[in-house]
Amino acid sequence: MLLAGAIFILTIVLVIWQPKGLGIGWSATLGAVLALASGVIHIADIPVVWNIVWNATATFIAVIIISLLLDESGFFEWAALHVSRWGNGRGRLLFTYIVLLGAAVAALFANDGAALILTPIVIAMLLALGFSKSTTLAFVMAAGFISDTASLPLIVSNLVNIVSADFFKLGFTEYASVMVPVDIAAIIATLVMLHLFFRKDIPPTYELARLKEPAKAIKDPATFRTGWVVLLLLLVGFFVLEPMGIPVSAIAAVGAAVLFAVAKKGHGINTGKVLRGAPWQIVIFSLGMYLVIYGLRNAGLTDYLSDVLNELADKGLWAATLGTGFLTALLSSIMNNMPTVLIGALSIDGSTATGVIKEAMIYANVIGCDLGPKITPIGSLATLLWLHVLSQKNMTITWGYYFRTGIVMTLPVLFVTLAALALRLSVTL
């Protein structure tokens, strides 16, 4: 147990710290090699772990490539400018619409896409409107927060969702039928908390005339138009083809390939830059990190957590839902959500929970790992990258400020979201 734990801690430190620019994939690989060399894991564990991660990572990469291509075409800036006009010069309405745009982008393009793509666009738009630094910070924090809290509804909305759905063999429609209503509750709770927390920083009015026409944001009309078609077909494909046994990754890959072909033909987008910007290291990272996690499982860590979950299960649906969600949220905030989701899944699988109680734990694990990372900067890799992007835009958010904001914002939203899950599973739709 001690050796497996030491290897895990070393791996997490390297992944978060990234000394001398060491990629997350290589840090995780080092951890996996150490685990294999020390006997913490075995050769036979590699295909088992690969079976857990391949579909998730392939889907994630395809979705991010689609989002990068659409970003280069001007799709997201066009959308942001439109919702800004819907605000009709009223600051609170603009704030609400930006948050709802972030929720929509997170649902369709994953939380990473929402945070990293929308943030620079929102900053540029707010600068054009002449907003103060405190107002800009409020909007940026809101965009970053909603990208995670609203990444629940679809399997493709978060890498955590894909990993968990693959592990427990959850179908796309089955997952969405539970989590779409839960996500709506999360969005409402997030909106309320954001308006309360940043109420003094949101201006009463803004000048619409300062914003450029949305049409001027479109840089590649062909890719822009094709993007709408691809998104529609992807959603249809996810709901129709996935139940037939076609992997979500294959459906997403076809969509990415079609959009990429259109973008390459148009010459308006540097497709090579897009490919280089795709998160290829996530494949190596997921395999390496999850091999390290499997070492913790082999050492018996997940057995301890299974015992805790068994006690929660004995207390009923609400205790199982809230207990699992808050436990995995805490673990995610301390040791990152990617390792936590697999630890949670293995622990749930090893518990004696059955029926709706086990189902509640599965979805609560996802919620905890999606929302928990908002408590601390190290909760997710996307947050660390997001903070880096902000620093490049001369917006430095200290870890202390992030934690103070995160803890106040996250806990109420997490409670409401988990309560919505318990209510959803209490009724048969």
From Swiss-Prot:
Superkingdom of origin organism: Bacteria
Keywords assigned by UniProt, alphabetized:
Arsenical resistance, Cell inner membrane, Cell membrane, Membrane, Plasmid, Transmembrane, Transmembrane helix
User: What is this protein called in UniProt?
Assistant: Arsenical pump membrane protein
User: Which GO terms fall under biological process for this protein?
Assistant: response to arsenic-containing substance
Q: What does this protein do?
A: Involved in arsenical resistance. Thought to form the channel of an arsenite pump.
Q: Name one GO cellular component term.
A: plasma membrane
Q: What is its subcellular localisation?
A: Cell inner membrane
Q: What residue stretch is flagged as signal peptide?
A: none
Q: How does it sit in the membrane?
A: Multi-pass membrane protein
Record organism: Escherichia coli
Transmembrane residue ranges: 24-44, 46-66, 98-118, 121-141, 178-198, 228-248, 249-269, 274-294, 316-335, 407-427
Q: According to its UniProt record, where is this protein mainly located?
A: membrane
The record, for PANTHER family, names:
TRANSPORTER ARSB-RELATED
Q: Which GO terms describe its molecular function?
A: antimonite secondary active transmembrane transporter activity; arsenite secondary active transmembrane transporter activity
Against Pfam families, the record matches this protein to:
ArsB (PF02040)
Task: Respond yes or no to whether keyword Membrane is given for this record.
Answer: yes
